[in-house]
């Protein structure tokens, strides 16, 4: 095809899913002239699978995105139809906020934000090729022949890269939700030497809300107490007219139908070669893998206020359409349900993420960044977190400024990216609280304290919001100091309160911060029992209470972080030749040469590098033997 020279930009972002939107907004807000290209303007920030944001670990990522100046938290706070805090009976390290989204409002609100952002141009186009000159990415070429030049390019292709949809025996080339797939871009990446592989994900059927018998299901309402993802959202704006979700279960009859039709499932017939997600398996996989279970939970989730569609959560399937309907009709409450869209599996290309650095720049091509599902992750939140980091670094690169990264001790986003570039992934990667060694430091409640300063330094947090943040920090310290001054006396009221908690009496006066360390004692209880009011609002009090109750555990993790940072400070030279280092095990040598860790701490986290290998590498790097080998 004949090409023509179109406009020139500082940063080009390819793909306008959750990763692409964050990348483009970050770049534009940092002052870079940015172009956001999408296969379809109707798919901007679209939710092709579950209509929700947040959950364990993921909800904290959304708070981190917001603390850094990203958009996902603000957008969901404007468009949710239900909000719930999960794991409230557990410790603060695993509490998680989850919102049910109006997926259509979410898309429209994000598109409106992008269209009204200075420095940002949104355009519909299919990117077929990259412009690469002397090992540097300098733009893209579309299927209409337009050549857009840029200083940096961010790829966020999602599941569109050579996407193929499967519904029983039917399969066809397609992106998510029957959009155009991106075929030639994958071929371009392969020509440039990138290693691609095939992953698979899936989505469940959507059913008509009016054909459900809700009397046979269990209602899951939202929280009455105000909850927000964005630190800028106000309690007075909290939605009180929330929409319920509903829960039901599969049963032995459902499982019987699935087992009878496994030969028609592309997951089991061999038609699908891509690796599926471990933590979000299809209903067929669950029935086969957990044959001892006679039922599996199903959640019925509204997709919005202006649609009749209900998402049948935890019922992902690629069975033939008529089998899907037969399966649904066995479920309590769904006996007469009408299916509006069948579920499907989608297979797509991903780039092995060990080919990236912690900035999400590729090692092979400079100024080329990748983010989202094309890096092997699953989930909107993981994609958005990567998109934000890629967009920040693309903007910094365009200005010739130092890169920005987050460590495992600083954010779940840091854990996510480090896992990807250090360990790679053999299946769609899902972020879990268990993946974070320092999860007591990486909580939902303190994301602003961890990251707002960084967002302000980057130019993504304005001065007014930064002033509010500093005021909150001052109030936290003021209330911590105040609790160290207030005395709780052993009054009748105090000891009756303790007896109600099943605790021993107070025999003498103690400082309020010491009293607060007792189990189930809250800041509000201390205020009531002492008659002393603290200065902060409920969010400040929450922070103060956690800081006091978990002080010992937090201190322990801070000591571990200090050790990590000492190891992170020990840089490995980029041009080190691992073949010249004697004593390394063969597996360690191969893994180190493939991943090329930047620090000794990263090398330590590589599977296959044992303590003996690390000790040898440490000696070579720290004692100057590296230099001798080079000579």
UniProtKB/Swiss-Prot annotation:
The keyword Cytoplasm is annotated on this UniProt entry: yes
UniProt keyword Transmembrane helix present: no
UniProt keyword annotations, A-Z: Cytoplasm, FAD, Flavoprotein, NAD, tRNA processing
Cofactors demanded by this protein: FAD
InterPro entries: FAD/NAD-bd_sf (IPR036188), GIDA_C_N (IPR049312), MnmG (IPR004416), MnmG-rel (IPR002218), MnmG-rel_CS (IPR020595), MnmG_C (IPR026904), MnmG_C_subdom (IPR047001), MnmG_C_subdom_sf (IPR044920)
Pfam families cross-referenced by the UniProt entry: GIDA, GIDA_C_1st, SAM_GIDA_C
Biological process, per Gene Ontology: tRNA methylation; tRNA wobble uridine modification
Residue span of region Disordered: 214-233
Listed PROSITE patterns: GIDA_1, GIDA_2
Gene Ontology cellular-component terms listed: cytosol
MF terms in GO: flavin adenine dinucleotide binding
Residue positions binding FAD: 15-20
Protein localization: Cytoplasm
Residues that hold NAD(+) according to the record: 276-290
Record's subunit section: Homodimer. Heterotetramer of two MnmE and two MnmG subunits.
PANTHER family membership: GLUCOSE INHIBITED DIVISION PROTEIN A, PROTEIN MTO1 HOMOLOG, MITOCHONDRIAL
Family in the record: Belongs to the MnmG family.
Function: NAD-binding protein involved in the addition of a carboxymethylaminomethyl (cmnm) group at the wobble position (U34) of certain tRNAs, forming tRNA-cmnm(5)s(2)U34.
Protein's name according to its UniProt entry: tRNA uridine 5-carboxymethylaminomethyl modification enzyme MnmG
Species assigned in the record: Lactobacillus delbrueckii subsp. bulgaricus (strain ATCC 11842 / DSM 20081 / BCRC 10696 / JCM 1002 / NBRC 13953 / NCIMB 11778 / NCTC 12712 / WDCM 00102 / Lb 14)
Gene name of the encoded protein: mnmG
């Amino acid at each position: 095809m004949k090409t023509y020279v179109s406009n020139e930009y500082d940063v080009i972002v390819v793909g306008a899913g959750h990763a692409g939107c964050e990348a483009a907004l970050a770049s534009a807000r940092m002052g870079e002239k940015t172009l956001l290209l999408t296969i379809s303007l109707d798919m901007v920030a679209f939710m092709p699978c579950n209509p929700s944001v947040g959950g364990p670990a993921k909800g904290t990522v959304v708070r981190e995105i917001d603390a850094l100046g990203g958009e996902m938290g603000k957008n969901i706070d404007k468009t949710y139809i239900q909000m719930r805090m999960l794991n409230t009976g557990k410790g603060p390290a695993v509490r998680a906020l989850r919102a049910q989204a109006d997926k259509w409002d979410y898309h429209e609100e994000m598109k409106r934000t992008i269209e009204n952002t200075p420095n940002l141009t949104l355009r519909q186009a299919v990117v077929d090729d990259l412009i690469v000159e002397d090992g540097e990415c300098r733009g893209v070429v579309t299927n209409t022949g337009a050549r857009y030049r840029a200083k940096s390019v961010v790829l966020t292709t999602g599941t569109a890269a050579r996407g193929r949809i499967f519904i029983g025996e039917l399969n066809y080339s397609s992106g998510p939700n029957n959009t155009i797939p991106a075929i030639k871009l994958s071929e371009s990446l392969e020509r440039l030497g990138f290693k691609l592989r095939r992953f698979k994900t899936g989505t469940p059927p959507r059913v008509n809300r009016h054909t459900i018998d809700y009397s046979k299901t269990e209602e899951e309402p939202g929280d009455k107490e105000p909850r927000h993802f964005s630190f800028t959202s106000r309690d007075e704006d909290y939605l009180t007219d929330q929409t319920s979700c509903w829960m039901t279960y599969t049963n032995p009859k459902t499982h019987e139908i699935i087992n009878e039709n496994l030969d028609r499932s592309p997951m089991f017939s061999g038609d699908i070669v891509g690796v599926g997600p471990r933590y979000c398996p299809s209903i067929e996989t669950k029935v086969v893998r957990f044959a001892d279970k006679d039922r599996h939970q199903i959640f019925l989730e509204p997709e919005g206020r202006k649609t009749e569609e209900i998402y049948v959560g935890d019922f992902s399937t690629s069975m033939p359409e008529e089998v899907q309907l037969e399966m649904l009709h066995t479920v309590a409450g769904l006996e007469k349900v009408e299916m509006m869209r069948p579920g499907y599996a989608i297979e797509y290309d991903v780039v092995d993420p060990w080919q990236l650095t912690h900035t999400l720049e590729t090692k092979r091509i400079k100024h080329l960044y990748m983010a989202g599902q094309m890096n092997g992750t699953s989930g909107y939140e993981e994609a958005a977190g990567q998109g934000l980091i890629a967009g920040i670094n693309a903007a910094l690169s365009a200005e010739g400024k130092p890169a920005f990264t987050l460590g495992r001790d600083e954010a779940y986003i840091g854990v996510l990216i480090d896992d990807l570039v250090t360990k790679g992934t053999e299946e769609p990667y899902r972020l879990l609280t268990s993946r974070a060694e320092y999860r007591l430091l990486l909580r939902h409640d303190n994301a602003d304290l961890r990251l707002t300063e960084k967002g302000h330094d980057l130019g993504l947090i304005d001065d007014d919001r930064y002033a509010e943040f500093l005021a909150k920090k001052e109030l936290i310290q003021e209330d911590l100091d105040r609790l160290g001054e207030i005395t709780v006396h052993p009054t009748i009221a105090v000891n009756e309160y303790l007896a109600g908690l099943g605790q021993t009496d107070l025999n003498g006066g103690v400082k309020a911060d010491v009293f607060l360390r007792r189990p189930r004692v809250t800041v509000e209880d201390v205020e009531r029992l002492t008659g002393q009011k603290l200065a902060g609002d409920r969010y400040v009090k929450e922070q103060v209470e956690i800081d006091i109750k978990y002080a010992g555990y937090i201190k322990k993790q801070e000591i571990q972080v200090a050790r990590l940072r000492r190891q992170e400070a020990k840089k490995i030279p980029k041009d080190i030749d691992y073949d010249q280092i004697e004593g390394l095990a063969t597996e360690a040598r191969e893994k180190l040469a493939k991943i090329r860790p930047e620090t000794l701490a990263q090398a330590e986290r590589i599977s296959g590098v044992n303590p003996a290998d690390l000790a040898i590498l440490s000696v070579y790097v720290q004692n100057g033997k590296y230099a001798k080998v080079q000579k």
